[in-house]
């Protein structure tokens, strides 16, 4: 069934309270990490997103049985690995699925995983994943778009990542968590999602040290037991709603947030003139009546400004008079939103990974999202301007934002997604 576009009518202030979902980017590797245990595990805070259903389809192929036991609670059980391959038809849908390589290798000793897919912008190679596994004693062969991995005994040794990689760090941790070896990872990612995966594994009996630092040490254990765990809040969704409040010059209260995960975003919005108040896991973002200032932004790995919020920041800065500059060296090709914002009247000049934005007033237009975060930029832009903006490519938004239209309506947004017309033989 073809998804119908989002119809967004903006030009009004938003207000009220919106609960931030739990982190998709932590939930996906944590779901994969349940492969390391033969006992049932219940996860809380699992967003019902298309990416989650995709990874569950792959997990089912590998031998996992799952059941939703609450609106966002999921029990998974993998008594044994039934298949050690992750075929292209499943892996090609989503890049994050590649970390099953390390998990299957740890549990079964051998794994075959196809090259990953996901959002269609730019190259995001997996060479650091493969180099890490090889350095730790696994044999990994690439042939015809597939990776064949095998280990004899436990992984051991150390590896220095050549660049910061969240997925590569996940894969190496999962591969080394079981067994009798000791593995040290240097220049490892300190991303919040990596920390959450480590804390989840340790809750099941793993022995992993150094979470939140660039040096992670994994002492292999014989087995992991079952248990329960709650995934952290989604800092990217929180940042998206913070920018929505700023772009629409509104006051929004965000709940279920981790302000300590949002320092780079908070400081940049404060520099623009947005008032932000924190109270535990609540955050009030107030841009009412404020003349926001242009800023310069450069993306970095955590704890820097996240590349996953770069398109949303472009949409916000397109509404701020003056000249702003955004540089995204993390993913230089993440620019699919720019042409669509042009259709809405934005003035953005691109050179390499640099955007020079002359802020002004946007207008409604038909646009199309080509990836998840571009879609977020477009619904932010649509809610800033009068008239109806029709956003196609809703399938990408469904990868990262749960019940988006319903939740935006809850804070005063006029956002509709008509039911699709069914053919007579459907």
Swiss-Prot record:
Keywords: Cell cycle, Cell division, Cell shape, Cell wall biogenesis/degradation, Cytoplasm, Peptidoglycan synthesis, Pyruvate, Transferase. It is found in: Cytoplasm. GO terms for biological process: cell division; cell wall organization; peptidoglycan biosynthetic process; regulation of cell shape; UDP-N-acetylgalactosamine biosynthetic process. SUPFAM superfamilies: EPT/RTPC-like. The keyword Cell cycle applies. The active site is at 119 (proton donor). Pathway: Cell wall biogenesis; peptidoglycan biosynthesis. One of its GO terms (cellular component) is cytoplasm. The keyword Cell cycle applies. It holds the Pfam family EPSP_synthase. Phosphoenolpyruvate binds at residues 24-25. GO terms for molecular function: UDP-N-acetylglucosamine 1-carboxyvinyltransferase activity. InterPro entries: Enolpyruvate_Tfrase_dom, Enolpyruvate_Tfrase_sf, MurA_subfamily, RNA3'P_cycl/enolpyr_Trfase_a/b, UDP_GlcNAc_COvinyl_MurA. CDD domains: UdpNAET (cd01555). The modification 2-(S-cysteinyl)pyruvic acid O-phosphothioketal is found at residue 119. UDP-N-acetyl-alpha-D-glucosamine binds at residues 95, 124-128, 308, 330. Cell wall formation. Adds enolpyruvyl to UDP-N-acetylglucosamine. PANTHER family: UDP-N-ACETYLGLUCOSAMINE 1-CARBOXYVINYLTRANSFERASE. Belongs to the EPSP synthase family. MurA subfamily. This is UDP-N-acetylglucosamine 1-carboxyvinyltransferase. The gene is murA.
């Amino acid at each position: 069934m073809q998804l119908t576009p989002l119809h967004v009518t903006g030009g009004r202030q938003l207000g009220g309270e919106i609960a931030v979902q739990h982190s998709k980017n932590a939930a996906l590797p944590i779901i994969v990490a349940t492969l390391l245990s033969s006992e049932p595990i219940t996860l809380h805070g699992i967003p019902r997103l298309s990416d989650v259903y995709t990874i569950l389809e792959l997990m089912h192929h590998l031998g996992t049985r799952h059941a939703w036991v609450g609106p966002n609670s999921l029990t998974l059980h993998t008594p044994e690995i039934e298949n050690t391959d992750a075929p292209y038809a499943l892996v090609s849908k989503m890049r994050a699925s590649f970390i099953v390589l390390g998990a299957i290798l740890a549990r079964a000793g051998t794994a075959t995983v196809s090259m990953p897919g996901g959002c269609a912008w730019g190259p995001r190679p997996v060479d650091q994943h493969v180099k890490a596994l090889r350095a730790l004693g696994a044999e990994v062969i690439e042939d015809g778009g597939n990776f064949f991995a095998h280990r004899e005994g436990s992984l051991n040794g150390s590896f220095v990542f050549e660049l910061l990689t969240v997925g590569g760090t996940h894969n190496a941790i999962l591969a080394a968590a079981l067994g009798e070896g000791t593995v040290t990872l240097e220049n490892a990612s300190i991303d919040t999602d990596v920390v959450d995966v480590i804390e989840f594994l340790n809750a099941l009996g793993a022995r992993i040290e150094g979470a939140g630092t660039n040096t992670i040490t994994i002492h292999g254990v014989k087995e992991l037991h079952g248990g329960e765990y709650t995934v952290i809040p989604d800092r990217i969704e929180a940042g998206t709603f913070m920018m929505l409040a700023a772009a629409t010059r509104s006051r929004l209260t965000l709940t279920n947030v981790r302000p300590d995960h949002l320092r780079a975003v908070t400081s940049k919005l404060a520099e623009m003139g947005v008032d932000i108040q924190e109270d535990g896991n609540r955050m009030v973002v107030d841009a009412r009546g404020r003349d926001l200032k242009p800023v310069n932004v450069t993306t970095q790995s955590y704890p820097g400004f996240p590349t996953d919020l770069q398109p949303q920041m472009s949409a916000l800065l397109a509404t701020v008079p003056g000249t702003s500059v955004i540089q995204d060296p993390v993913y230089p090709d993440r620019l699919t939103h720019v042409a669509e914002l042009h259709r809405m009247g934005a003035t953005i000049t691109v050179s390499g990974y640099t955007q020079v934005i002359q802020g002004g007033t946007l207008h409604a237009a038909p646009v199309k999202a080509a990836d998840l975060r571009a879609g977020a930029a477009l619904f932010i832009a649509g809610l800033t301007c009068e008239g109806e903006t029709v956003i196609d490519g809703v399938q990408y938004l469904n990868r990262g934002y749960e019940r988006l239209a319903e939740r935006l309506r809850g804070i005063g947004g006029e956002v509709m997604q008509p039911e699709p017309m069914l053919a007579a033989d459907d």
